A protein has these predicted regions:
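C-terminal flanking tails of non-heme Fe-dependent oxygenases
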Residues: 1-84, 89, 130, 136-330
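A short, charged helix-loop
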Residues: 97-127
Protein backbone atom coordinates (compact mmCIF):
# COMPACT_ATOMS: atom_id res chain seq x y z
CA UNK A 1 0.00 0.00 0.00
CA UNK A 2 1.12 3.55 -0.68
CA UNK A 3 2.19 5.78 2.21
CA UNK A 4 -0.65 7.75 3.83
CA UNK A 5 0.17 11.35 4.80
CA UNK A 6 -2.06 13.63 6.86
CA UNK A 7 -1.63 17.31 6.02
CA UNK A 8 -3.01 18.37 9.40
CA UNK A 9 0.16 16.90 10.95
CA UNK A 10 2.02 19.88 9.49
CA UNK A 11 0.16 22.19 11.88
CA UNK A 12 1.74 20.64 14.99
CA UNK A 13 4.92 19.04 13.62
CA UNK A 14 5.91 20.69 10.35
CA UNK A 15 9.42 19.21 10.36
CA UNK A 16 8.12 15.67 10.84
CA UNK A 17 5.50 16.05 8.13
CA UNK A 18 8.04 17.47 5.69
CA UNK A 19 10.38 14.55 6.26
CA UNK A 20 7.59 12.05 5.59
CA UNK A 21 6.50 14.02 2.52
CA UNK A 22 10.02 14.12 1.11
CA UNK A 23 10.67 10.43 1.73
CA UNK A 24 7.35 9.30 0.24
CA UNK A 25 8.14 11.22 -2.93
CA UNK A 26 11.69 9.85 -2.94
CA UNK A 27 10.85 6.20 -2.29
CA UNK A 28 7.67 5.73 -4.34
CA UNK A 29 6.68 9.03 -5.96
CA UNK A 30 3.05 8.35 -5.01
CA UNK A 31 1.13 8.66 -1.76
CA UNK A 32 -2.35 9.14 -0.30
CA UNK A 33 -3.10 12.56 1.21
CA UNK A 34 -5.75 12.95 3.91
CA UNK A 35 -6.48 15.99 6.08
CA UNK A 36 -6.21 18.11 2.93
CA UNK A 37 -8.97 20.56 3.82
CA UNK A 38 -11.05 20.18 0.65
CA UNK A 39 -14.68 19.99 1.76
CA UNK A 40 -16.53 16.71 1.27
CA UNK A 41 -19.47 18.64 -0.20
CA UNK A 42 -17.18 20.03 -2.91
CA UNK A 43 -15.81 16.56 -3.67
CA UNK A 44 -19.31 15.10 -3.88
CA UNK A 45 -20.42 17.92 -6.18
CA UNK A 46 -17.70 17.49 -8.82
CA UNK A 47 -18.14 13.70 -8.86
CA UNK A 48 -21.92 14.00 -9.24
CA UNK A 49 -21.60 16.56 -12.04
CA UNK A 50 -19.07 14.34 -13.80
CA UNK A 51 -21.50 11.43 -13.72
CA UNK A 52 -24.33 13.61 -15.01
CA UNK A 53 -22.23 14.81 -17.93
CA UNK A 54 -21.12 11.35 -19.00
CA UNK A 55 -24.67 9.97 -18.71
CA UNK A 56 -25.82 12.31 -21.48
CA UNK A 57 -26.24 11.21 -25.12
CA UNK A 58 -23.19 11.31 -27.37
CA UNK A 59 -24.53 14.19 -29.46
CA UNK A 60 -24.87 16.35 -26.33
CA UNK A 61 -21.34 15.55 -25.17
CA UNK A 62 -19.97 16.22 -28.64
CA UNK A 63 -21.32 19.77 -28.56
CA UNK A 64 -18.00 20.55 -26.87
CA UNK A 65 -15.89 18.14 -28.93
CA UNK A 66 -12.16 18.75 -28.57
CA UNK A 67 -11.98 18.73 -32.36
CA UNK A 68 -13.45 22.25 -32.14
CA UNK A 69 -10.61 23.50 -29.91
CA UNK A 70 -7.12 24.41 -31.16
CA UNK A 71 -6.17 24.55 -27.46
CA UNK A 72 -7.03 20.85 -26.89
CA UNK A 73 -9.96 21.69 -24.59
CA UNK A 74 -13.35 20.05 -24.33
CA UNK A 75 -14.69 16.53 -24.75
CA UNK A 76 -12.75 13.59 -26.19
CA UNK A 77 -14.74 10.54 -27.22
CA UNK A 78 -13.70 7.02 -26.26
CA UNK A 79 -10.45 6.34 -28.10
CA UNK A 80 -9.77 10.04 -28.65
CA UNK A 81 -6.48 10.02 -26.73
CA UNK A 82 -3.34 7.93 -27.19
CA UNK A 83 -0.54 6.80 -24.91
CA UNK A 84 2.62 5.41 -26.48
CA UNK A 85 0.76 5.25 -29.78
CA UNK A 86 -2.00 3.03 -28.40
CA UNK A 87 -5.65 3.97 -27.89
CA UNK A 88 -6.77 4.78 -24.34
CA UNK A 89 -10.19 3.36 -23.49
CA UNK A 90 -11.71 6.43 -21.87
CA UNK A 91 -13.79 9.52 -22.52
CA UNK A 92 -12.98 12.84 -20.89
CA UNK A 93 -13.22 16.61 -20.68
CA UNK A 94 -10.05 18.73 -20.58
CA UNK A 95 -10.32 22.02 -18.68
CA UNK A 96 -7.55 24.61 -18.46
CA UNK A 97 -7.30 28.27 -17.50
CA UNK A 98 -9.85 30.38 -19.40
CA UNK A 99 -7.77 33.02 -21.21
CA UNK A 100 -7.76 35.00 -24.42
CA UNK A 101 -6.16 33.47 -27.49
CA UNK A 102 -2.84 35.12 -28.38
CA UNK A 103 -3.02 36.45 -31.94
CA UNK A 104 -0.28 34.98 -34.10
CA UNK A 105 0.84 32.65 -31.31
CA UNK A 106 3.52 30.11 -32.12
CA UNK A 107 4.72 26.96 -30.39
CA UNK A 108 3.34 26.24 -26.97
CA UNK A 109 1.58 29.60 -26.72
CA UNK A 110 -1.04 28.06 -29.00
CA UNK A 111 -2.22 26.15 -25.92
CA UNK A 112 -3.54 29.36 -24.36
CA UNK A 113 -7.21 30.06 -24.94
CA UNK A 114 -10.77 29.45 -23.75
CA UNK A 115 -12.40 26.30 -22.47
CA UNK A 116 -15.37 24.60 -24.08
CA UNK A 117 -17.94 24.39 -21.30
CA UNK A 118 -20.95 22.06 -21.46
CA UNK A 119 -24.40 23.65 -21.38
CA UNK A 120 -25.52 20.85 -19.09
CA UNK A 121 -25.52 19.77 -16.34
CA UNK A 122 -26.26 23.05 -14.59
CA UNK A 123 -23.49 24.37 -12.39
CA UNK A 124 -20.69 22.47 -14.12
CA UNK A 125 -18.52 25.49 -14.89
CA UNK A 126 -18.91 27.12 -11.47
CA UNK A 127 -18.09 23.87 -9.69
CA UNK A 128 -14.92 23.22 -11.67
CA UNK A 129 -13.77 26.83 -11.43
CA UNK A 130 -14.02 26.43 -7.66
CA UNK A 131 -12.24 23.06 -7.89
CA UNK A 132 -9.34 24.67 -9.72
CA UNK A 133 -9.05 27.32 -7.01
CA UNK A 134 -9.12 24.79 -4.16
CA UNK A 135 -6.66 22.32 -5.66
CA UNK A 136 -4.24 24.98 -6.85
CA UNK A 137 -3.99 26.25 -3.27
CA UNK A 138 -3.52 22.70 -1.96
CA UNK A 139 -0.83 21.88 -4.51
CA UNK A 140 1.13 25.06 -3.83
CA UNK A 141 0.99 24.35 -0.11
CA UNK A 142 2.55 20.93 -0.72
CA UNK A 143 5.25 22.44 -2.94
CA UNK A 144 6.26 24.85 -0.17
CA UNK A 145 6.59 21.96 2.28
CA UNK A 146 8.71 20.06 -0.24
CA UNK A 147 10.93 23.08 -0.80
CA UNK A 148 11.80 23.37 2.90
CA UNK A 149 12.28 19.61 3.22
CA UNK A 150 14.87 19.79 0.42
CA UNK A 151 16.86 22.58 2.06
CA UNK A 152 15.50 25.42 -0.10
CA UNK A 153 13.54 28.57 0.69
CA UNK A 154 9.83 27.95 1.14
CA UNK A 155 8.93 30.16 -1.84
CA UNK A 156 11.53 28.80 -4.28
CA UNK A 157 8.85 27.44 -6.63
CA UNK A 158 6.35 30.30 -6.22
CA UNK A 159 7.52 32.48 -9.12
CA UNK A 160 6.86 29.73 -11.67
CA UNK A 161 3.19 29.70 -10.65
CA UNK A 162 2.69 33.38 -9.81
CA UNK A 163 1.42 34.48 -13.22
CA UNK A 164 -0.68 32.48 -15.66
CA UNK A 165 -0.13 28.94 -14.37
CA UNK A 166 -1.12 26.30 -16.93
CA UNK A 167 -3.10 24.04 -14.64
CA UNK A 168 -5.20 21.26 -16.16
CA UNK A 169 -8.25 19.35 -14.98
CA UNK A 170 -9.30 16.13 -16.66
CA UNK A 171 -12.75 14.73 -15.96
CA UNK A 172 -12.46 11.09 -16.99
CA UNK A 173 -14.69 8.05 -17.41
CA UNK A 174 -13.36 4.59 -18.26
CA UNK A 175 -16.20 2.41 -19.62
CA UNK A 176 -16.16 -1.31 -19.02
CA UNK A 177 -14.88 -3.48 -21.88
CA UNK A 178 -13.61 -6.95 -22.68
CA UNK A 179 -11.76 -5.76 -25.79
CA UNK A 180 -8.70 -4.06 -24.27
CA UNK A 181 -6.82 -3.77 -20.99
CA UNK A 182 -5.53 -0.23 -21.61
CA UNK A 183 -7.60 2.38 -19.86
CA UNK A 184 -4.55 4.63 -20.09
CA UNK A 185 -1.11 3.29 -20.95
CA UNK A 186 1.96 3.38 -18.73
CA UNK A 187 3.45 6.86 -18.48
CA UNK A 188 4.91 9.52 -16.22
CA UNK A 189 3.19 12.87 -15.75
CA UNK A 190 5.07 15.62 -17.54
CA UNK A 191 4.36 18.51 -15.17
CA UNK A 192 5.10 19.21 -11.52
CA UNK A 193 2.45 17.58 -9.35
CA UNK A 194 -0.81 15.65 -9.78
CA UNK A 195 -3.72 15.47 -7.32
CA UNK A 196 -6.08 12.64 -8.24
CA UNK A 197 -9.65 12.25 -7.02
CA UNK A 198 -11.11 8.79 -7.66
CA UNK A 199 -14.77 7.94 -7.24
CA UNK A 200 -15.22 5.44 -4.40
CA UNK A 201 -15.17 1.88 -5.72
CA UNK A 202 -13.33 2.81 -8.92
CA UNK A 203 -10.41 0.41 -9.24
CA UNK A 204 -7.77 0.08 -11.96
CA UNK A 205 -4.91 2.46 -11.11
CA UNK A 206 -1.53 0.73 -10.91
CA UNK A 207 1.90 2.12 -9.98
CA UNK A 208 5.26 0.65 -10.95
CA UNK A 209 7.71 0.20 -8.08
CA UNK A 210 11.47 0.55 -8.49
CA UNK A 211 11.67 -3.26 -8.64
CA UNK A 212 9.50 -3.27 -11.76
CA UNK A 213 6.51 -4.71 -9.91
CA UNK A 214 3.11 -3.16 -10.61
CA UNK A 215 0.87 -2.65 -7.56
CA UNK A 216 -2.83 -1.81 -7.36
CA UNK A 217 -3.74 1.60 -5.93
CA UNK A 218 -7.39 1.52 -4.89
CA UNK A 219 -9.13 4.73 -3.80
CA UNK A 220 -8.86 5.53 -0.10
CA UNK A 221 -11.75 7.21 1.67
CA UNK A 222 -11.32 10.99 2.08
CA UNK A 223 -7.93 10.91 0.31
CA UNK A 224 -6.34 12.31 -2.80
CA UNK A 225 -3.75 10.22 -4.59
CA UNK A 226 -0.71 12.46 -5.13
CA UNK A 227 2.19 11.87 -7.50
CA UNK A 228 5.29 13.67 -8.68
CA UNK A 229 5.73 14.91 -12.25
CA UNK A 230 8.88 14.90 -14.35
CA UNK A 231 9.67 18.57 -13.77
CA UNK A 232 9.93 18.03 -10.01
CA UNK A 233 12.17 15.03 -10.63
CA UNK A 234 14.41 17.26 -12.77
CA UNK A 235 14.35 20.07 -10.17
CA UNK A 236 15.72 17.69 -7.54
CA UNK A 237 18.26 15.89 -9.71
CA UNK A 238 16.19 12.73 -9.47
CA UNK A 239 15.88 12.73 -5.68
CA UNK A 240 12.11 13.01 -5.98
CA UNK A 241 10.73 10.35 -8.26
CA UNK A 242 8.28 10.68 -11.15
CA UNK A 243 6.78 7.21 -11.27
CA UNK A 244 5.27 5.30 -14.16
CA UNK A 245 1.62 4.46 -13.71
CA UNK A 246 -1.30 3.17 -15.75
CA UNK A 247 -5.02 2.48 -15.54
CA UNK A 248 -6.49 -0.88 -16.49
CA UNK A 249 -9.78 -0.76 -18.38
CA UNK A 250 -12.69 -1.87 -16.18
CA UNK A 251 -14.43 -5.17 -16.91
CA UNK A 252 -17.77 -5.21 -18.78
CA UNK A 253 -20.81 -3.72 -17.01
CA UNK A 254 -18.64 -1.54 -14.77
CA UNK A 255 -16.86 1.78 -15.22
CA UNK A 256 -14.42 4.13 -13.48
CA UNK A 257 -14.64 7.89 -12.90
CA UNK A 258 -11.69 9.99 -11.80
CA UNK A 259 -10.66 13.65 -11.82
CA UNK A 260 -6.90 14.26 -12.03
CA UNK A 261 -5.69 17.80 -11.34
CA UNK A 262 -2.32 18.71 -12.84
CA UNK A 263 -0.53 21.54 -11.04
CA UNK A 264 1.56 23.05 -13.80
CA UNK A 265 3.51 26.33 -13.90
CA UNK A 266 3.23 29.04 -16.54
CA UNK A 267 3.90 27.87 -20.08
CA UNK A 268 7.14 29.85 -20.28
CA UNK A 269 8.27 28.98 -16.75
CA UNK A 270 11.41 27.04 -15.90
CA UNK A 271 11.34 25.18 -12.60
CA UNK A 272 14.44 26.10 -10.54
CA UNK A 273 17.01 23.40 -9.82
CA UNK A 274 17.38 22.78 -6.08
CA UNK A 275 20.89 22.59 -4.61
CA UNK A 276 20.29 19.62 -2.33
CA UNK A 277 22.08 19.20 1.00
CA UNK A 278 24.96 16.74 0.70
CA UNK A 279 23.17 13.94 2.54
CA UNK A 280 20.21 14.14 0.13
CA UNK A 281 22.32 14.61 -2.98
CA UNK A 282 24.17 11.40 -2.12
CA UNK A 283 20.84 9.52 -2.33
CA UNK A 284 19.73 11.04 -5.63
CA UNK A 285 19.24 8.57 -8.46
CA UNK A 286 19.66 11.12 -11.23
CA UNK A 287 17.00 11.97 -13.79
CA UNK A 288 15.77 9.03 -15.85
CA UNK A 289 16.39 9.67 -19.54
CA UNK A 290 14.02 8.52 -22.29
CA UNK A 291 15.21 9.34 -25.82
CA UNK A 292 11.65 8.95 -27.12
CA UNK A 293 10.26 11.38 -24.56
CA UNK A 294 12.78 14.15 -23.82
CA UNK A 295 12.17 16.52 -20.92
CA UNK A 296 12.53 20.20 -21.89
CA UNK A 297 13.54 23.01 -19.56
CA UNK A 298 10.39 25.10 -20.03
CA UNK A 299 7.05 23.64 -19.08
CA UNK A 300 5.33 24.81 -22.27
CA UNK A 301 7.59 22.73 -24.51
CA UNK A 302 6.70 19.62 -22.52
CA UNK A 303 3.01 20.46 -22.60
CA UNK A 304 3.02 21.05 -26.37
CA UNK A 305 4.85 17.77 -26.97
CA UNK A 306 2.40 15.87 -24.78
CA UNK A 307 -0.75 17.40 -26.25
CA UNK A 308 0.19 16.98 -29.88
CA UNK A 309 1.23 13.37 -29.34
CA UNK A 310 -1.76 12.41 -27.21
CA UNK A 311 -4.33 14.07 -29.50
CA UNK A 312 -2.97 13.71 -33.05
CA UNK A 313 -6.37 14.38 -34.62
CA UNK A 314 -6.56 17.85 -33.03
CA UNK A 315 -2.88 18.51 -33.78
CA UNK A 316 -3.37 17.71 -37.46
CA UNK A 317 -6.71 19.49 -37.86
CA UNK A 318 -5.73 22.78 -36.21
CA UNK A 319 -1.94 22.88 -36.39
CA UNK A 320 -1.02 20.85 -39.48
CA UNK A 321 1.04 18.37 -37.48
CA UNK A 322 1.01 14.91 -39.04
CA UNK A 323 0.50 11.98 -36.64
CA UNK A 324 3.76 10.40 -35.55
CA UNK A 325 2.36 7.39 -33.74
CA UNK A 326 4.61 7.92 -30.71
CA UNK A 327 2.13 9.46 -28.34
CA UNK A 328 2.31 9.93 -24.62
CA UNK A 329 -0.35 10.60 -22.04
CA UNK A 330 -0.69 13.92 -20.32
Amino acid sequence: MLPVLDLTDADDDAAGFRTRLREAAHDVGFFYLVGHGVAQAQIDEVLALSRKFFNQPADVKNEISQLKSPQFRGYSRIGGELTNGEVDWREQIDIGPDRQVIDGAEGYWRLQGPNLWPSSPDGFRAAFDAWDHALSALGLRLLRHWAVSLGAQEDVFDAAFAELPATLIKVVRYPGTADTTQGVGAHKDSGVLTLLLVEPGSEGLQVELASGQWIDVPPLRDAFIVNIGELLEVATGGYLRATRHRVLAPPPNTDRVSIPYFLNPALDATIPIIALPAELAARSRGVEADPNNPIYSSYGENAWKSRTRAHPDVAELHHGISPRGNASAY
